[in-house]
Amino acid sequence: MKFIIFSSCILFVWCDVVLAQPLPIASIDQKEPVSYAKDIAPVFKKSCIACHNATKAKAKLNLENVSVMMKGSDSGEVIVPGNAEDSLVFLQAAHQEEEFMPPPKNKSNAPNLSPKELALLKLWINQGAKDDDTIAAEKKVNFAAMSEKVNAIYSVAVSPDNQYVAAGRGNRIFMYHTPTGKSLGELVDTELKGKGGSAHVDIVGSLAFNSDGQLASGGFRNIKLWQQADPDLVYDAEPVDNVPLVAGVSSDSELFSVGDESGSIKVYISESKKVVTFKDHVTAITGVGFGVGGNIIATSIDGFVSSRKIGEAAQVATVKLSSPINAMAVINGGEQVACGCDDGVIRVLSIEASLEQVHELKGHTAKVVSLSSFGEDLKGFVSGSADSTLRIWQVGEGKVNQVKQINNDQAPISIAASNDGKRCASVSGNAKIRIWNMSDGKLVADGDAGWKLSGEQKSKEMKVSVLTKIRDERKKQLGESDKKLKADQESLKKAQDAEKKSVEELEKKKAELVLAKDLNSKAEVDLKQKEEAKDPELKSAKEAAKKATEALTAKQKEVQDVERKQLEATRSREISERFLKRAVDADSKSKLRLADAENDLKNAAKIHTDIKARVDQEQKILRTVTFSADSAQVFAGSDDGNIYSWETNAGKPCDVIAAKSGLTKAIVAVGKKILVASADKTVRIWDFTPTWNLYKKIGGLQDSKTLVDRVNSLSYSPDGKLLASGGGVPSRSGELKVWNVADGKLVCANIESHSDTISGISFSPDGGFIATAATDRFVKVFNMEGAVLERSFEGHTNHVLDVAWRADGFVLASGGADQVVKEWDFEKGSQKQTVKGHTKGVSSIAYMGIGEQLISSSGDQSVRIANKPLPDAATFIHSSSVSKDGTIIAAGGEDSILRIWTTGDSKLYLKLQ
C-alpha cells in the first residue's frame, strides 16, 4: 500500500480507514482538454491549499501550481501524468487511499471534492496534467487610478550632490530643488496618463539616487529608472555676425536683442521667429534694451546712444555723450535710459524726449562698467564701477538719489539686480561671485564657480578619511593576529615539549613495568617451588610474592596513568596545531586585508591629490551675471562655456550647466528661461529647469516572474552601475535581485533570501556585499558572487524595516517594528549594541556621512540624530534619507509634508507640500 505523509494535516481515525467508503465520481463526457486554471486550481484552493502552500507545506507538498506539484512530497511523486489511478493526489482526494485529502474534521473546514470535481481531476491527470495557468496569468489585470487621498510620503531620497530631493507621495513622485526649495514638478510615466498621470499605478515604496544622479523608483512588480535630462534648448536663434557683447529683453519677454562688437544689433521676435538687424553704430555695442512704446535703445563704446522703432527703420534718434559709454540700463518704467560712462558719471536720458539728458549722477571715482535696473516699474538700478564699489540708485519725481553704497572689494566687470529688489550680484573676472543684500548692503554669499570640483575634492577627502580608518583597523587586526599567532606558536611548543616528556616518561614506566613483571614471575616461581618442597621459608616466600604482585599492579597503574597523560598531551598538541593553523590563516588574511587597505588608501590619496591640484589650477572666470525672473537664482556665464548658478537666499550653489557653446559673453533672463550669447556667435534660449525622463523599466504589472510583488527597497552600488532590489510575497518569500543599470538585465538573485518580504536593502561601501532587512525579523548579508548568504543576524523581536552600513563597512545598523535600533559587527557576526528611545517602529536608519552617528526615523513622529529628536517632525514618519555628506536630512510621512533639516545646527530648513 502506498503511503504519503499528510499527518499534520490529517485527523487520523482508525475506524475511518477501515469503514470509510470511496467518494463517488461522476461520469462525464468531455472531449475538450480540462483547464487547470479554470477547473482544477479553484478546487485545490477550496479544499487543499490551506494545508499545502509555500508557507505551510504539509509533508513538503505544495499544491499552489502545477510546477511545484510535480516536485512531489516527502514520499515522492504525487501526480503521474496520464495515469490518475497511480496519482496519490487523485487517490487520496477520492478517498481511495488512507490519509484522505482533505482529512475528516479538518480545522480549515475544507470540504471533500464533489463527484464532478473528482471526475475533472481524474480526467485532467489522464489528459497529461497540462499546465495552462501561465496562460491565464497573462490575462491583463486592470488597475484603477489611485485616489488622490492616498498622498502620504512613503519614500524619500536625497541626490548625492544635495541638489534634489525626491518624494514618493502615494503613486506619484515629486521632485524638489533643495537649495531654493522650489518644486520641480512630478515624474510621469506617459503610459499611465489614463490612470491619472502618475509615476506608478501603486504606492511608490522605494526611491534611490545613484552617484550619477539617476533616480530609481520601486512600485508593484516594476522598477523605473529616471535620468536627468539635458537643458532644454527652447530657441536656437539666428547667430550674430560678430562676437556678441550684450543682450536685452522686453518687459513682456516677446522681444530680445543682442549687440555685437561691430556695432550691429539683432532683434528677435519670439512669436514669429522673425529677426531684424540694425546697424546704427560703428563701434562695439555696450548695452541694448527696450523702452516704452517698443523703442530699441542701444549704446556703444564711442559714446553714442540710439533709439528706434522696430518697424520704422529710417527713424533713428541718436546722441553722442561726452564720455565713452561702458554700460546701459532702461529705468523709470521704460521712459529713461541710464548710461554708465568712462568718466565715472552716470548720465540719464529721456527716451521719449529724443534722448535729452535729464540727470547727471556723480559719485563713482572710476569708470562705470555695469548697470542693472530692478523692480516692476524699473524705479531702481545698481551701478558697478572700477572703483570697486556698487551703488544703489532710486528714481523719484524729477530726481535720482543714491541710497546705498557697497564696497565690492574688487572692481566688478558685470553686475545684476534681482527683479524683487532684494539682491544684487557682481562678478569680477575671476571665479568669485558676490551676492549682496540691497536693503542693508551686507554680503549674503561669496560664491566660487569651482564649487562642484571643490565638492568632489571634499568627497575624495572623505573617502581618504574612511580608508585611513579602515587601514588603521586592519593594522590593529594584524597586530592582534600576530599576537595570537605568537601565543599559539608558544602554546604548540609547550604542547610538543609536554608530549615529548610524556613519551619519555611512558617509555621509562614501561621499562619499570617489564622489570616488575620479571620480579613478579620470579617470586611466583619461588613460591611454587617452596610450596611443593614444603619449605619452612614458605611464609616469607608468600610475602615476597604478594609484594611483587602489588608492585606489578602499581607499575601497571602507573603505566596506564602515563599512557593517559601521553594521550592527553598528544591531543593537546593536535589542538594546538589546529589553533596555530587557524592563527596562521588569520594572520595571512590580516596581512592581505592590510595590503588591500593600504593599496586602496594609496589610490584614493592619489585621486584626491590630483583633484586638489585641479582645484588649484582650474581658475574659472565669470564674466556676466543675471538673475532668474523669479529672483530665486542667479546665473553667471564663464569663459569655459558653462553657466553657474546659486540660490539667492543664502547663496548656496545650485548647478553647473553645459550650455554647449563657447565663452559666454552675455546672459539675460527671458521670462522663466535664460538667453545665452556666446563667443562662437550663437544666440540660444535655454530652459535650465531640471527635468527627468523615464529611461528604463524593469519588470511590469502583468509580469510576476521578473519581480514577484512590490519593490519595497532599492540600493545602488557605490559606482552606480548595479541596482539591488528587495521585495517578495508577504508571509511567503524574500526576493533579492541585482540588476545591471545599463541594460536592465539581472546580474544575480536569491529569491529565497528570507522567509518574508524584504523591507530594507543596502550595498556595502566597497560594493562587495548586500545587506537586507526583512519582516521575518532577520538582518542578512549576501555576497555579490551569486547573492550567496554570508552572514545572518538575529535579535530583533519584530519586523526589521531598514538596514544601513557604516562608511567603513565594519558595522551595520538596523531598525525595526520592535522600536529599537541595533548595531552589528559584520566581520564577527555579532551584535554590538541595542539603542532604545523610539516609542513606535523605526522606519528608516542611516549613518550620517562618514561618521558613526545614526539617523533614525519612526512612526512616533520623530527623526533623530544620535537618538536626539529633530524639531517639528510632527507626523508618522514613513521614510527618511540623509545626504551622502551627512549635511541634510529629508523625511516624509502621513501628513504628506516633506521636511528637510540641516544637520550642522539641527534646524528645520524646508517644509514642502
Q: For the regions a protein language model found, what residue spans apply to each?
A:
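Residue-level signal for beta-strand positions within conserved beta-sheet cores that form or flank
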Residues: 16, 59, 732-734
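Aromatic- and Gly/Pro-enriched helix-to-coil junctions and flexible linker segments
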Residues: 19-164, 169-172, 179
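Secreted/processed peptides and extracellular or luminal domains of membrane proteins
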Residues: 15, 54-57, 795, 837
